[in-house]
Each structure stands twice: as structure tokens, then as C-alpha cells.
Amino acid sequence: MSGVVRTLSRCLLPAEAGGARERRAGSGARDAEREARRRSRDIDALLARERRAVRRLVKILLLGAGESGKSTFLKQMRIIHGREFDQKALLEFRDTIFDNILKGSRVLVDARDKLGIPWQYSENEKHGMFLMAFENKAGLPVEPATFQLYVPALSALWRDSGIREAFSRRSEFQLGESVKYFLDNLDRIGQLNYFPSKQDILLARKATKGIVEHDFVIKKIPFKMVDVGGQRSQRQKWFQCFDGITSILFMVSSSEYDQVLMEDRRTNRLVESMNIFETIVNNKLFFNVSIILFLNKMDLLVEKVKTVSIKKHFPDFRGDPHRLEDVQRYLVQCFDRKRRNRSKPLFHHFTTAIDTENVRFVFHAVKDTILQENLKDIMLQ
């Protein structure tokens, strides 16, 4: 029997070893399968979190014609929601302010000449020639020491009644709206150690090229505000920003009813804004998007209504052209008439984008409107 046992043992041992290997291989496959399932669950959970985040994200698109105040509004969002401008940004704004002053003053000197307005002081002819000789073809930043060389001429020119008269006729040519503010503050801005204040930053004018975004959080709700250039050459970029938007803030410069576009020097600026608004508000892409009209530059409108009749440029106006309430009502009606879908009201606000408290107050109301209209399933409290 012992021989049989030994024979059986020799036959059985290899079979047992092979079974163990098979059991180990099967166990490894099951482990790999469990790991694959775990990874799949992790990926699904991550994708679900991302989808929830996308649904929660409030994406606001700033649209409107050039120089309507979109970039200023975006800067206000940074200021209001606590994101300070760093040293690099301050230096860039300083460069922009120097450029605004030099270019704006050159425009005034040239306009005085073309409009045939005499100098109050004949010696300012030399100051004007000195300023007109300034060239910056390379577009390099103007250093404070260089800018200081022009400050005496700039100050003398701004005091001259000839330049002031040209400024009073600025609707007849293209002049940045911040030029007066900067020239009034020339003593401060002309210092070697000058750095822009928040108000200076808000008034610094540089055309937006491309797409600028700002992210902030309100009551745990993430907001993304997107600014794209409003000039005609920049509008083809708008379509890159349409995906996933929650709301459109459409900005209009309410005071520009007597001005023409810089691009063609022919089209009335308010008419251009109405045409763009009509295209946006009736686009099927935005049927479920809240569109809020911001009639901006209220501070300038208040002053302009006193002296410039809107009826001269818009003959269908009915009312007192020098009564602010009548002009405001007409402006809202002009844009409201462009809407083909009358099922929803037109939300609108008169704003002054350079006034931080005004923007803070208006955006608080706008935020509630946006969330009520588009994010009813999100609890803010």
C-alpha cells in the first residue's frame, strides 16, 4: 500500500500546486476588477461634483457697444468684492492714465485749432506745439519723469479758455470722458511718486481687446463675470462666451444720444446700442437667459439733459427734453420696443459705473433678480 500511496502522492501534488496558482490568479483578477470599479465610482463622483459646480456657477456676460462702461463695471466688482490691484496692475493703470491725459490734451489742442477758437493767452501756442510734437509710435509706457516734463504745458493749456471752449464742444469730436477728471487732478498725478487711487483706476480708459474674466463668491454662490470688447472689430469674439451663461448685463451709455461712433464717425452711438440690443434680446440662444439693461453714465446724462436737447437727435421724442424723468422714460421705451418676446418684463437700472456705492446697490438688486430668474433651486440663506 505504501507504494500506491507514494504513487498517488506524486500524482496529486502537482495538481494541488496548479490549483493554488489558479486560485491566486483568480483572486488577482477580482482585485483588479474591484480597483477598476472603485476608480470608475471615483470618476463618476468627480464628474457629478463638476456638474453640480457648473450648475451652481452664475456666469454673467457684459455686453454693449464700446465705451459703454463694461470694463469700469468689472473693475468695480473687483473693488467691491475685495480683490485688490497688485503693484503690476497699478503700474499698468498709471501708464494708461498718462496716455489718456497726453492723447486727450492733444485732441483738445487739435480741436481748438480746427474749430477756429482763439487762444486766451498767446504763449499757449508754444505749449500746444510742444504737446503736439509728442510721439509714442512704439506704444511704450511713459515714465513719470518724462510725463513731468509735460505737466507745465498741460496745466497752462487746461487753464486757457480756448481749450475750455473746445472741451465744451466735445460732442463734435471724439474725446475720452475721463480727460477732464485727470486734468483737474494734474497736480497730484504729475508727482514722481504718483500711484493711481481707486477712483483714478475706475476712470482709466483702455479699450478691451479679447476676453477679461473676474471670479468672485457671494453667499457661497460662485460668480464669473466676463467682459468682451464692445468695438465693432471685437464683437466676433462675443460668440466664444455664450456657452453656459446665466445672465447678460447689457450696458448702454445713456448720455451719448448726441454723439457718433469713433469707428465710422457717422452712426449715432445710442442708435448703435439699440441695434446691438435688438440682436441680442431676440436671439433664440438667450430665450432662457435673463437680460438686464444698464443705462449707464447717469451722472453725465443729468448734466447733458440741461443743455442738449435729445429731440434734436431723436425727433420722435415726446416730453420736455430738459426734464430728466422724461428723457429716462424715453430711453427705456426705445430699448423696450426692440423686444419681440413680451412674456417677460425688461429689467433695467440707471447706473453710474464710476460710483462704487451706486454699483454696489444696483448689483445687489441685480444679483437677486438673476438668482430668482435662473437659480430658483439654490438656497442662498
Swiss-Prot record:
GO terms for molecular function: D5 dopamine receptor binding; G protein activity; G-protein beta/gamma-subunit complex binding; GTP binding; GTPase activity; metal ion binding; protein phosphatase 2A binding; protein phosphatase activator activity. A lipid is attached at residue 11 (S-palmitoyl cysteine). Residues 223-232 are annotated as: G3 motif. It is found in: Cell membrane; Lateral cell membrane; Cytoplasm. G proteins are composed of 3 units; alpha, beta and gamma. The alpha chain contains the guanine nucleotide binding site. Interacts with UBXD5. Interacts (in GTP-bound form) with PPP5C (via TPR repeats); activates PPP5C phosphatase activity and translocates PPP5C to the cell membrane. Interacts with RGS22. Interacts (via N-terminus) with NAPA; the interaction promotes CDH5 localization to plasma membrane. Interacts with CTNND1 (via N-terminus); the interaction regulates CDH1-mediated cell-cell adhesion. Residues 292-299 are annotated as: G4 motif. This is Guanine nucleotide-binding protein subunit alpha-12. GTP binds at residues 67-72, 202-205, 296-299, 353. Keywords: Cell membrane, Cytoplasm, GTP-binding, Lipoprotein, Magnesium, Membrane, Metal-binding, Nucleotide-binding, Palmitate, Phosphoprotein, Transducer. Residues 200-208 are annotated as: G2 motif. Pfam families: G-alpha. Guanine nucleotide-binding proteins (G proteins) are involved as modulators or transducers in various transmembrane signaling systems. Activates effector molecule RhoA by binding and activating RhoGEFs (ARHGEF12/LARG). GNA12-dependent Rho signaling subsequently regulates transcription factor AP-1 (activating protein-1). GNA12-dependent Rho signaling also regulates protein phosphatese 2A activation causing dephosphorylation of its target proteins. Promotes tumor cell invasion and metastasis by activating RhoA/ROCK signaling pathway and up-regulating pro-inflammatory cytokine production. Residues 56-381 form the G-alpha domain. GO terms for cellular component: brush border membrane; cytoplasm; focal adhesion; heterotrimeric G-protein complex; lateral plasma membrane; neuron projection; neuronal cell body; plasma membrane. GO terms for biological process: adenylate cyclase-modulating G protein-coupled receptor signaling pathway; blood coagulation; cell differentiation; embryonic digit morphogenesis; G protein-coupled receptor signaling pathway; in utero embryonic development; negative regulation of vascular associated smooth muscle cell migration; negative regulation of vascular associated smooth muscle cell proliferation. The keyword Iron does not apply. It comes from Homo sapiens (Human). The modification Phosphothreonine is found at residue 208. Residues 59-72 are annotated as: G1 motif. It comes from the Eukaryota. Residues 351-356 are annotated as: G5 motif. Its main location: membrane. It is a lipid-anchor. Belongs to the G-alpha family. G(12) subfamily. Mg(2+) binds at residues 71, 208.
